[in-house]
Amino acid sequence: MNCFAPLPKWRHTFTLDWGTPWWGFDLLLRWRYLGSTTTDRSSSEPLLKSAYYPSTATIPAYNYIDLGGSIPVGDHVELRAGVNNIADKNPPLILNGALTDCPNTTCNNNTWVGTYDTLGRYIYFNVTAQF
């Protein structure tokens, strides 16, 4: 993890898409993985080492599972529905990295929204019509 965002050594998205033999029903399973990461500030390297919060120096690995499906309705309409982040896993709570304004609280910057799923579990429904 650097000062801008977590950079795990390993992260991936694995998608399994099964076109079932039943009425054109398509089933999708997605696994999103973010490996664990440690702040550069806890490094033994003198150029990287600086003050940090020990409680958030390491972020554990995160797994998110999504499930969806689609089915054609007639020749020109497709229905799609699914659930992202089925387990409703919350993002890691990270203390303020500045170590100045809020040393004992999370302030407003309590996670990395560009890296972790901050919406929690959400259900979606989609209709696609082709003309």
List the predicted regions and their residue ranges.
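C-terminal beta-barrel architecture of Gram-negative outer-membrane proteins
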Residues: 2-72, 88, 96
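C-terminal beta-signal and adjacent terminal beta-strands/loops
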Residues: 32-44, 70-131
